[in-house]
Every structure is written in structure tokens, then in C-alpha cells.
Amino acid sequence: EILSGLVGSEMCIETEPYFLHQKELDPTYIGTTTVQKCVRTNDIDNIGDARHLSFFEMLGNFSFGRYFKKEMCAWAFEFSTEVLGLPKEKLYFTVFEDDDETIEIWKSLGVAEDHISKLGEEDNFWRAGPTGPCGPCSEIYFDQGPEVGCGKPDCKPGCDCDRFLEYWNCVFTQFDGQEDGTLAPLQTKNIDTGMGLELSLIHIS
């Protein structure tokens, strides 16, 4: 049994038993939060560009069936605009290509439709590995301005340039990936987020 780790690689292994309901959180709490020290291994070749560090701290919040998309999106938007003080016109959002529900939630919070992009499984469906808890995700980006971009008229989040910098990933962990590639619904719909501490500090400085 893994109780904790010194460092991770952008996944919180301690929460998996709770997503699978092998363990239960004290019902007094609606979720839990973490600060995780991470070392990049999955994209080590990208270290040194303007978007990737070899080491960073990831802030996370997790829910095991107590809240889901509507609450998470509202809190993420509120925290970004009211606590961090980021101007909402600088915020852009990506969603999984089949997730129209999350698009409507962002729009209901006042996000302009042209600030929301659909991306495919590679970008907006999060998996810890070939099997286990997984689900579509919605990422929040900060627009650093056209002066650091590629100059292309269709530049948007997901572009390889440095204009749009992702700082928060909200994962809607609702499936259990099987060895045959199928997705079995989990017992509850859950939340797993990761916010880059250093990237967030860049945006508010």
C-alpha cells in the first residue's frame, strides 16, 4: 500500500483508492486538497522551454462523489478572477471534444464562446495510465499576449507557441479504464485538479 511519496509526476496515486471506493473519505469533508512536488518525466524533452520546468509544485483539489463539473468550474472561475485577480478576458478554456456540458457551464459563468476550444483525447482526456480512473478534462489558459505568440491568425490554446499558457487542469474522473480499452463508469462522478503553483505566480506577478 502506498501512503505517500517524496515526489510525483503529475498524478496523485494516493487518491486512486478513493475514486474506486476501496477507501472512503470522512463524510465530514466534501473533498481534500494537496500540494505535490513533481518531477517531469513524461515530457522531459520539453524541459527548458517557456512552458515546462524540471520540477514544480502542483496544487490539487479532489472530490469523491461530493461535487462535480458545475461546482468545480464555478469555483475555478471564481478563484482565477477574484482570488488571483486574473482578468477574465485573458482566460481561455479547452474542453474534451464530446463534452458539450462543460462548454455550457463555462458559458453560463460569463465565458465568451470564442474563448472556449474543443480538443481531442490526447489533450483533454486525462489518464493516469493504461487502466484505472480517468475522464475528460477542461484546462484553463492565460493569454500572455500576441507578442510571445506565433503570429498565426488561428492561434489558440493547444498551439505550440508560448502565447497561451495552461495553469489549471480540471479532470472529471468518472470512468475506470479497462484493459480492453473500454470505459466503465465509476461508482461516483469525481473531481481531480492540478494547478501549477509557479505558472500561477507568473500570471499574477
What positions do the PLM features span?
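Charged, often glycine-rich, active-site loop that binds/positions anionic groups
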Residues: G8-I13, T102-W106
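Short, charge-rich binding segments
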Residues: Y29-G31, D45-G48, V83-G85
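Active-site cavity-forming subdomains of large catalytic enzyme subunits
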Residues: E57-C73, F79-L201, S205
